[in-house]
Every structure is written in structure tokens, then in C-alpha cells.
């Protein structure tokens, strides 16, 4: 019998994680969704219609206290609650084993533990965490232990960068590196200019600007590949596209290699131990070609360049929504397999 799972926060990632689970035949059974800021009818609407990923292929109806979803002849009744305090969400009453914490509001160990006060056994945070252990599927997920009850899937950018970084570091060694992600618009940005805390540029209109921004993705990679600590950092440019982002990793290598040798190493990993996580393309692709791409990172052999045999710029694409949501599900299922 499939494990019982809950979702807290029915935003971009919460909804897409549910879509991924449904597309896979619901290998973990979502029994409760909590979101205090949206009605059940509105939940059904934003789940059914998606500007980026298209209309849901089944039916979804908002009823009193639940969503009724039908897909491929299967009917799924999912209870809905609207608690602001995670400790008050009826996870225990619903026998929820793992909560997918996708609200973005409870990303520390202390805050995530509130879900456990509500009766959940484990919490999977769908964002980087300041103190919870972080795992990138395909890179270090095998180190997740059964007794780790709060853990993070890191960020979409970390999930793109880490597999590529692992291949390059394992094969050639990275002396130091700088990462830039050219990142699509996200929900935290503004449609028109407005105030934005200390990072004033983040408050500028998303559709009309390229916005330099900070990112913890490179630092998070050093949490999953500790030997790179102090040797890798990065930044972000937010750009006015709806979805799909791209990582530029500029690195100094320990072992000299031609660009062709680097491409061969990545292709070998993409067809081997990182198959399904890391992809490889040598075609003339652009960002929209990767909408709906389930892999974490697709290396673009045509886009990268080498200055010499020890200084290279490598490029890898990712669907920052769908690819990341697939890894959330993979890490969820892996955690449920541990005893």
C-alpha cells in the first residue's frame, strides 16, 4: 500500500509535485493539502490550468473540504485544510508519513519540526535550508539515513549544478569555480516596481528587466560535495521568461583536458550513473525546448567554451519547475524506501 503523504503550500512546486505523482500513478498517496491562503475552488482552478505546463489532462473539482481528481480512470480524493500554524495541521489524524513542505515559510529545522508536532513523521523541505541536511538526487541522496526526519531537496539551481559539478570534479578536479544562473521569473518577484527589503533590485518589474540577484545554489553544492567548500560560489540574473533556466559554470581544472574530453565525460555520466538526472545535448537548443524536461540538468555541448585545457565555461539547462518537482518526488520515494 502506498505511503500517505501531505503537501503544505499549494504554490508552483506544491502543485507540480502533485502533477508528477499523478503522472507516475501516485506511487505515494497524497491524502491532505494544506494552504491557508486559497479556497478549495481556487485550488482546483490553478491546478487545472497552468500557463507554462498546460492544462491538467484529467479532471479536478473543488468540493467541501477536498479536491476530487480523476486521471486515467482513477479517482483521488484529497482532503484540504487551511491552517497557518503547521502544528495545527491534522497530519496525524490523516496518518501522513511525509510532509512535502513547499510553502517556502518553514525551511529551518525548528520550523519544520512544527509539522511533526501536527503528527507528521518526516518533513521534506522543497527549498535550501540553513540547518537541515540537504540532498541532491543522483549526487548524495544515498547518504540520507532512515532516522533523518527533516531534510531538504536543496534548490532547483543546486539540482542542476551539482550533477555537472560532480562529474567534472570527479574526473578532472575543480581548483575553483564561479557559477551564474540565468533564471526565469519566480513568484517572489514583482510585476511592477516596488519595495523589496534590503535587496532593492529584487523589487524591480520582472517583465521589464534583467535583475542581478544573489543565490545560495553554489554554496549549497558545497554542502552536498564538501570537498569543494571555499572553492565555488555564484550569482543569479533573473530574466523575463516564465520558465526554464540555465547554469554557466566557469571553472579552473586540476587535470588539463580538452573540451571534447570534458564533453565525453559528461556524456558518459549522462548515459551511466547519472542517467535520468543529467542529460546531454549537442543540438542547437534554446530555453523553451526544455519546458517539461524531467531531468535536473541537461549539458549543452554546443554552448560551452574553453580558453585552454584548464579554464572552461560549461553550460547546462534545467526546467526549474518540472525538473525540480521530479527530484522532489524521487527523493520522497527514496526516503520512503529506507527502514
From Swiss-Prot:
Its EC number is 1.2.1.12. GO terms for cellular component: cytosol. The keyword Cytoplasm applies. The keyword Cytoplasm applies. It comes from the Eukaryota. GO terms for molecular function: glyceraldehyde-3-phosphate dehydrogenase (NAD+) (phosphorylating) activity; NAD binding; NADP binding. Keywords: Cytoplasm, Glycolysis, NAD, Oxidoreductase. The record marks 183 as: Activates thiol group during catalysis. SUPFAM superfamilies: Glyceraldehyde-3-phosphate dehydrogenase-like, C-terminal domain, NAD(P)-binding Rossmann-fold domains. D-glyceraldehyde 3-phosphate binds at residues 155-157, 186, 215-216, 238. Pathway: Carbohydrate degradation; glycolysis; pyruvate from D-glyceraldehyde 3-phosphate: step 1/5. Pfam families: Gp_dh_C, Gp_dh_N. It catalyses: D-glyceraldehyde 3-phosphate + phosphate + NAD(+) = (2R)-3-phospho-glyceroyl phosphate + NADH + H(+). Belongs to the glyceraldehyde-3-phosphate dehydrogenase family. Homotetramer. This is Glyceraldehyde-3-phosphate dehydrogenase. The lineage of its organism: Eukaryota, Amoebozoa, Evosea, Archamoebae, Mastigamoebida.
Amino acid at each position: 500500500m502506498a505511503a500517505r503523504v501531505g503537501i503544505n503550500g499549494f504554490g508552483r512546486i506544491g502543485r507540480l509535485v502533485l502533477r508528477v505523482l499523478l503522472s507516475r500513478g501516485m506511487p505515494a498517496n497524497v491524502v491532505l493539502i494544506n494552504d491557508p491562503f486559497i479556497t478549495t475552488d481556487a485550488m482546483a482552478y490553478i491546478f487545472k490550468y497552468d500557463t507554462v505546463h498546460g492544462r491538467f489532462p484529467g479532471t479536478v473539482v473543488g468540493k467541501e473540504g477536498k479536491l476530487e481528481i480523476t486521471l486515467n480512470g482513477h479517482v483521488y480524493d484529497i482532503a484540504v485544510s487551511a491552517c497557518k500554524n503547521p502544528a495545527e495541521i491534522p497530519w496525524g489524524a490523516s496518518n501522513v508519513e511525509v510532509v512535502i513542505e513547499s510553502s517556502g515559510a518553514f525551511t529551518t529545522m525548528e520550523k519544520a519540526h512544527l509539522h511533526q508536532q501536527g503528527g507528521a513523521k518526516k518533513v521534506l523541505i522543497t527549498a535550501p535550508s540553513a540547518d537541515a541536511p540537504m540532498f541532491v538526487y543522483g549526487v548524495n541522496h544515498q547518504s540520507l539515513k532512515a532516522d533523518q526526519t527533516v531534510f531538504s531537496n536543496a534548490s532547483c539551481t543546486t539540482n542542476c549544478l551539482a550533477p555537472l559539478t560532480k562529474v567534472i570534479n570527479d574526473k578532472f578536479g575543480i581548483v575553483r569555480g564561479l557559477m551564474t544562473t540565468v533564471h526565469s521569473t519566480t513568484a517572489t518577484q514583482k510585476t511592477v516596481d516596488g519595495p523589496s527589503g534590503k535587496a532593492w533590485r529584487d523589487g524591480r518589474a520582472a517583465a521589464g528587466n534583467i535583475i542581478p540577484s544573489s543565490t545560495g545554489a553554489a554554496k549549497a553544492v558545497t554542502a552536498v560535495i564538501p570537498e569543494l567548500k571555499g572553492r565555488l560560489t555564484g550569482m543569479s540574473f533573473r530574466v523575463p521568461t516564465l520558465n526554464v533556466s540555465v547554469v554557466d559554470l566557469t571553472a579552473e581544472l586540476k587535470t588539463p583536458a580538452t573540451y571534447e574530453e570534458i564533453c565525453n565525460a559528461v556524456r558518459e555520466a549522462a548515459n551511466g550513473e547519472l542517467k535520468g538526472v543529467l542529460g546531454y545535448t549537442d543540438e542547437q537548443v534554446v530555453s523553451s525546448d526544455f519546458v517539461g524536461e524531467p531531468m535536473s540538468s541537461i549539458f549543452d555541448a554546443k554552448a560551452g567554451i574553453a580558453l585552454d585545457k584548464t579554464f572552461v565555461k560549461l553550460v547546462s539547462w534545467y526546467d526549474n519547475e518540472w525538473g525540480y518537482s521530479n527530484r522532489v518526488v524521487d527523493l520522497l520515494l527514496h526516503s520512503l524506501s529506507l527502514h
